[in-house]
Amino acid sequence: MTTAPVVHSLREQIREHILEGIISGRWQPGERIVERRIATELEVSQTPVREALRELESLRLIESAPNKGVRVRNLTAADLEESYPVRAGLEAIAAELAAERLAEDCSALEPHVAALYEADRLSDGTGQVRHTVGFHRELVRAAGNSVLLHTWEGLGIEVFTALSIRWLGTVQQSYAEEHEELVAAFRRRDPLIADLVKAHVLGCAPRA
């Protein structure tokens, strides 16, 4: 059985474009993001650009002010840290719901662990972010609960992880071993798996 390709709306595509610009450093903290310029660049109307910017504002990545337009927020460690207790709670629930499924089959997690070993070896921060987030997304997806996955995605995990590394330098030398240990814990049906996942996520939080 083949999986149907995911079709992203125009708004989602624009949001991803802006997110990539923030993560890559195209737009620096405090820098203005011009709605009209993005619309021209992507050859779209300003309406979906405005909708995408609203979503990013709800994630606290940008801020708007009357007569000043939209700017990238100057995020602090405290700002970034706030999402981690919520994320840890969600992933602990996901670990409990997914425990039996992942005990039998961890194939969705294993490629990310292998990729993390390679990213660690190369000190590839971009790869570390991509596969750390990919690992945790597959963990949450394995819970089989669409509300849980939607809520987790709504936290902006990937962009906050990337920004904490880019702006705050919260990079670790090794990401792979901790994630391999979680795979081993799922395989052995560790009764404390939810606590292990929660502690792991909280341990990744930037410190104010």
Protein language model features and the residues they cover:
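Short linear motifs at protein or domain termini
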Residues: 1-100, 205-208
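Generic detection of well-ordered alpha-helical segments
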Residues: 8, 12, 16, 20, ...
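Mobile beta-alpha loop/short-helix "lid" or hinge segments that flank ligand
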Residues: 58-63, 155-157, 172-173
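Hydrophobic packing residues in well-ordered alpha-helices of helical domains and bundles
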Residues: 83, 106-109, 128, 132, ...
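Hydrophobic, amphipathic alpha-helical faces that serve as interaction scaffolds
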Residues: 86-99, 133-170
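Amphipathic alpha-helical segments enriched in hydrophobic/aromatic residues interleaved with Lys/Arg
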Residues: 106-123
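C-terminal all-alpha effector/ligand-binding and dimerization domain
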Residues: 113, 117, 164-208
